[in-house]
Amino acid sequence: MLKKSVYSIIISISALIYAENDQYVLLVSMDGFRADYLDITDTPNFDKLSKNGIRSEGLKPVFISKTFPNHYSIATGMYVENHGLIANSFFASDLDKYYSMRDRETVENGNFYGGEPIWVTAERQGVKTASYFWVGTEAAIKGVHPSIWKKYDQKVPFEDRIDSVMTWFSLPISHRPRLIMLYFHEPDWTGHKYGPSSSKTVDQI
């Protein structure tokens, strides 16, 4: 259901861009989705995207290969030693504080996030952005949030997240975000718990 819905978003955005001759970016992360997952079960919608677009052979993560450092590296284009988010949990000696992805106060503290993520750059240029659970967007980094953002809540169904993104792309031009970043915690959570080749992980894929 998830992969079918995400494919629908991409098709809808393509139609929107064609109709209005404008540029939009949707960045989707399915955490822990290994490159070879596309080959261990049927993924017809990903196959369509691969056939009509492009598919890489893999992705080399930054070290350490954890969720928060890598997602923030994607957003900033920086290595972890430069943007400062060096792990999911760590002690920041310069701030004399402990950071944890499970601690709401630190997650929302912009002082932990170095560099300039893409949504901050865009907002400063007058380009509206939106995020559904992307790492870093809950903090006011350099005093800036995305125009639309959500506090992380893993219990929010994937379908609800997708519906929200579709709604954002349907907003009036003056309020419509041109960059949207969407995060799903699967298949990472299931893959860690049951293993990458388990039937439960395959079901998530």
Identify the residue ranges that each predicted region occupies.
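A generic structural signal for short
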Residues: I10, R34-A35, L59, T106-V107, ...
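Hydrophobic h-region of N-terminal signal peptides that target proteins for export
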Residues: I10-A19
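Beta-strand elements within well-structured catalytic alpha/beta cores of enzymes
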Residues: D22-R34, L49-S50, I74, A122, ...
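Sec-dependent signal peptide recognition
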Residues: L2-I10
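Short, structured active-site-proximal loop/turn typified by the sulfatase FGly-forming signature C/S-X-P-X-R
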Residues: D39-H83
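His/Asp/Glu-rich, glycine-adjacent segments
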Residues: Y79-Q204
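Short N-terminal helix/helix-N-cap motif within the alpha/beta-hydrolase-1
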Residues: Y37-L38, H192
